[in-house]
Amino acid sequence: MKFSVLLPTRNGGAYLENCIRSILEQNYADMELVISDNANTDSTPQIVAMFTCDPRVKSLRIDQPVSVTDNWNNAFRASSGDYTLMMGDDDYMLPCCLERIEEILERNNQPDCIVYNAYSYVAPDSINGNAQSFYSDSHFRFGPDLRVERFIEPGERFEIVRNMFRFKVGIPLNMQTVLVGRKAADKIRGGLFQAPFPDHYALNSLLLTAERWVFSPEKLLVVGLSPKSFGHYVYSNQQGGGLAYLGIKDDFDGRLPGNVLLNGMHVWLNLLKQNYSELLQGVAVDRAGYVRRQVYSWFLQLRLGTITVGEFRRNFSLLSPSDFGGLLAAIVDRESWERLWHMLCSWNRSDAETQWRSLHSLNEVVDIRQFAQWLSHRGAVER
């Protein structure tokens, strides 16, 4: 069984070597690493050249910068494995990751997709210039119905997608935490990765169309956040920079200022509805859910000092009477209360910890490879 690890990169040279080493150090023979160099102008070409003597490495170079989505598709088209796994240049594959994935596949008779968990690591200077490292023991907080390894039935998967249209996320929307079978990927209408958020669109398309999904609670890698990540722009409230990073626009009727992820989500939800209208009959983007989440983002931006009181008030003037009516639903929405409570409890904490629940500061660790070693040492102590 062959694995293709996709590694599209754009000026991630400062982090790339650790990522590549973590992949090539895997004790698994039948794999390929496909690196797509998106017209990098930093040290990336020199770092990639260090590894091209390894026959498992397939290196591609794009001479003129393209969008994130186009670069991802470039890597995917060049791959040949039975299953693909995406990595960012600031991520890290933990030891035995591919062996453990193969075991999950064998236990479940080679499903189309596997969703699993990960650790999160925030590199210094990634969020508003905070020089501290942070980590989370769970990259994603799954619901109580996803605790042990099992199949996710088609009806459950449809409900996960339906809840996306309500702006409620039930699985991590990161390609790093989902293994995708090639046959399932090739069935996606319009191609696997589509703008504005290629991973979000791909995963929801697969939830709708792939025959067999398996959930595993195992943590197989570290999802990194660095000063060059898209997450850096989101958590540092640099919305314009985030859009430029992705090379997209998020304009649509009824668009509100606030969180760029929510506006991008609105766009790809409509694209999903357009491409799978027969599977999504009666499902539509929930305006009230969108407004509720954006209003929360305004409170958060005010708390972080990235908008003024005047801008905060002007944002509310953009809401229609029906939008205000929809906000009343927040009274009975548990997630809204949890978000508000977390923000209040984090009032005197760092910007990173205010925005990211379950985040912990980490001393004497300055990069993701050190964090992986710290995890290994901690595990040995706990055992």
Give the location of each predicted region:
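Nucleotide-sugar donor-binding/catalytic module of glycosyltransferases
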Residues: 1-238
